[in-house]
Swiss-Prot record:
It comes from Protochlamydia amoebophila (strain UWE25). The lineage of its organism: Bacteria, Pseudomonadati, Chlamydiota, Chlamydiia, Parachlamydiales. Monomer. The gene is dinB. Its main location: cytoplasm. PANTHER family: DNA POLYMERASE KAPPA, DNA REPAIR POLYMERASE UMUC / TRANSFERASE FAMILY MEMBER. This is DNA polymerase IV. It is found in: Cytoplasm. The active site is at E106. Keywords: Cytoplasm, DNA damage, DNA repair, DNA replication, DNA-binding, DNA-directed DNA polymerase, Magnesium, Metal-binding, Mutator protein, Nucleotidyltransferase, Transferase.
Length: 350
């Protein structure tokens, strides 16, 4: 079997970097792109100076201002970011057409069969980053590895404006020391559970056989078994069609009533719409849906099949319907939308 050469390109603080490039007076100031702090907005991204104060993506804007009082919050210009992303993708296409965009600011490239630069994925990634800087005035980080999972992990290793290469021979030794929270799909709550079991890194996970993993993690066991060993069979799919988009929050303390659930909805909607704007040039919104995971880990979902609104009132209604099915403390809330490549025409009743 031919060893694959996968590159993951991740633009550095993309929205903020575009704004600093276009307005150099912002370069030495802490800035973020996001919503109004007075209207329950959230941060889409922050430059690295702001991150030193603890400002992070998906953080409420009011909290970001508390951490960094001098923070300049700019309203996002998604049309500009989409144009910039398109120009960057044109650079990718100079080397390969096997490109899988994940969002406006990151993508996977399969360069396994590319002959340019002597077929070296390392040199190709370096050349792409240099061209992005030369032609667009922006920096990118890159990860080079034998599969998508490892390439994405690698791109974060030397951020910002860095590159990390993981050869097939280095994978086993690298995985032993990789923290479990670096595994795709493991969030804060899952990581906390793993840590409580003494599983701090992938080497610890590798000591568990598949039967033990199944007892602990159910349907996720096989995925964990492979990923903790650096195994990922997924291909780079250039024509991937997305069927839905969602965001969710897992709470360290359960939400004990419906009103507490309602209070979380504006923040989730803001995060969802920021994510949608990144793909709105490709997809139309179809139907809203919600997901609730109760404290006993039972899950319910509700989809709105009649109206195509994606506002606060709609999601409150769906959350209420879902919550009333059990009327119990809530561990996780998720909001989402199904997607379509074609715009649906909604007929009126009269």
């Amino acid at each position: 079997m031919t060893l694959r050469k996968i590159i993951h390109i991740d633009m550095d603080a993309f929205y903020a970097s575009v704004e600093m490039r276009d307005d150099p007076s912002l370069v030495l100031k802490p800035i973020a792109v996001g919503g109004d702090p007075d209207k329950r907005g959230v941060i889409a991204t922050a430059n690295y100076l702001a991150r030193k104060f603890g400002v992070r993506s998906a953080m409420p804007s009011w909290k970001a201002k508390q951490l960094c009082p001098d923070l300049i919050i700019l309203f996002p210009d998604f049309d500009k970011y989409k144009r910039e992303s398109k120009a960057i993708h044109e650079i990718f296409h100079l080397f390969t057409d096997l490109i899988e965009p994940l969002s406006l600011d990151e993508a996977f490239l399969d360069v396994t069969d590319v002959d340019a630069l002597r077929g070296s994925a390392t040199w190709i990634a370096q050349e792409i980053r240099q061209l992005i800087w030369k032609e667009r005035g922006l920096t990118a980080s890159a990860g080079v590895a034998p599969n998508k999972f490892l390439a994405k992990v690698a791109s974060d290793w030397h951020k910002p404006n860095g590159q990390f290469v993981l050869t097939p021979k280095e994978v086993d030794a690298f995985m032993v020391h990789l923290p479990v929270e670096k595994i795709f799909g493991i969030g804060h709550v899952m990581a906390k559970k793993l840590h409580s079991l003494g599983l701090m890194n992938c080497g610890d996970l590798q000591t568990l056989d598949i039967t033990t993993l199944q007892k602990l993690f159910g349907s996720r066991a096989w995925n964990l078994y492979e990923l903790c060993r650096g195994i990922d069979h997924r291909f780079v799919i250039s024509d991937r069609i997305r069927k839905s988009l969602s965001v969710e929050s897992t709470f360290l303390e359960d939400l004990n009533n419906l009103e507490l659930c309602y209070q979380e909805i504006p923040n989730l909607i803001e995060r969802l719409m920021i994510r949608y704007e990144k793909i709105s040039n490709q997809y139309y919104k179809k139907k809203p849906f919600i997901k609730i995971k109760f404290a006993d880990f039972t899950t319910t979902t509700v989809e709105n099949t009649f109206f195509k609104a994606f506002d606060l009132e709609t999601y409150q209604t769906l959350i209420r319907i879902g919550w009333e099915r059990k009327k119990a403390p809530v561990r996780l809330l998720g909001l989402g939308m199904s997607l379509s490549l074609e715009e649906e025409i909604q007929l009126t009743l009269f």
